Curated annotation (Swiss-Prot):
GO biological process, one term: translation
Task of the protein: Removes the formyl group from the N-terminal Met of newly synthesized proteins. Requires at least a dipeptide for an efficient rate of reaction. N-terminal L-methionine is a prerequisite for activity but the enzyme has broad specificity at other positions.
Enzyme class: hydrolase
Name the record gives this protein: Peptide deformylase
Keywords assigned by UniProt, alphabetized: Hydrolase, Iron, Metal-binding, Protein biosynthesis
Catalytically driven reaction(s): N-terminal N-formyl-L-methionyl-[peptide] + H2O = N-terminal L-methionyl-[peptide] + formate
Gene designation per UniProt: def
Length: 169
């Protein structure tokens, strides 16, 4: 397994729309494993393949406290959503920045697991929010897209400054 490089804004590759996975095979399983390793190394709770410059419809999530409840979503489809909620969200591609984002309270999705088996899942709370956040990545959407242009600009400037400082270190 390997830790992959996470893209940061304003990298335009984050805006690419991911293509469906045609076959869940050993290569896709390796990507899933590398994505989990990357997500845990970065202390995230979710990661979309587009964030690591792999433009396929793959998401990994683990919102558990013990980091032992892995969820793999390959080619996820949103079937239903209901209610309204929102929390301050963060993103590995937008380091050290958070903002309140409106989301559905509950979602029902269909996806393939790591072995290519189809399943449906109903989620609420943090898991539902995380699923929506990561599914946005697959269509090139970031949480800052829900914010005003001024807030977007401020966050971009902060991330660019942080990346410059980290490049010097």
């Amino acid at each position: 397994m390997a830790v992959l490089q996470v893209l940061h804004i304003p990298d335009e590759r984050l805006r690419k729309v991911a293509k469906p996975v045609e076959e869940v095979n050993a290569e896709i399983q390796r990507i899933v494993d590398d994505m989990f390793e990357t997500m845990y190394a970065e202390e995230g709770i979710g990661l979309a393949a587009t964030q690591v410059d792999i433009h396929q419809r793959i998401i990994v999530i683990d919102v558990s406290e013990n980091r032992d409840e892995r969820l793999v979503l390959i080619n996820p489809e949103l079937l239903e959503k209901s209610g309204e909620t929102g929390i301050e969200e963060g993103c590995l591609s937008i380091p050290e920045q958070r903002a309140l984002v409106p989301r559905a309270e509950k979602v029902k999705i269909r996806a393939l697991d790591r072995d290519g088996k189809s399943f449906e899942l109903e989620a609420d709370g943090l898991l539902a929010i995380c699923i929506q956040h990561e599914m946005d990545h697959l269509v090139g959407k970031l949480f800052i897209d829900y914010l005003s242009p001024l807030k977007q600009q401020r966050i971009r400037q902060k991330v660019e400054k942080l990346d410059r400082l980290n490049a010097r270190a």
